Amino acid sequence: MNRRYALVLSLAALFTDFALANRSFAQAKSLKDQLVGTWIYISSTGKREDGSDVQRPSLQGAVTYTADGRFHFITTRTDNPKYASNETTRPSPEEAMAVASGSIAYTGTYVVDENTKTIHLNIETSTFPNLVGAPNQRRIITSVAVDEMKFTNPRTPAGVTLEFAWRRAK
């Protein structure tokens, strides 16, 4: 009698574990669902095609992905100068050059390819106009967790591969 009871308990435990595992698997979030939200810039590295490192400036920024397929991206140098005129439309030539060369922002729509872990971007507006409508704008997700994400921009217009690290905004 005790053997039957032990067998029944073992089988019940096995089926319960199986059912819970399947329920957890079915409830797993899609990659797109994991991306939705705002992410704060942590760091980035760059490599040229020959494998040499590209010096990266100290940056701050954020990227936001919405559930309806829109995104917004901005990074800017932490050492950008303040405008002496204190007016956004009246920087000195040096101030304007520093800000223009030390900042990038763009926005548009995105689609996630779950199989290749790739974010395909359609850039509609950018501080670098050459990106608007440019083909094959993609980011490859290298890792994503509840509070941290990393992606690679496989080839910038300058021929550099960038790896970005982000933490989820709280």
Where are these regions (language model features)?
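N-terminal export leaders
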Residues: 3-7
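Lipid interaction determinants
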Residues: 11-170
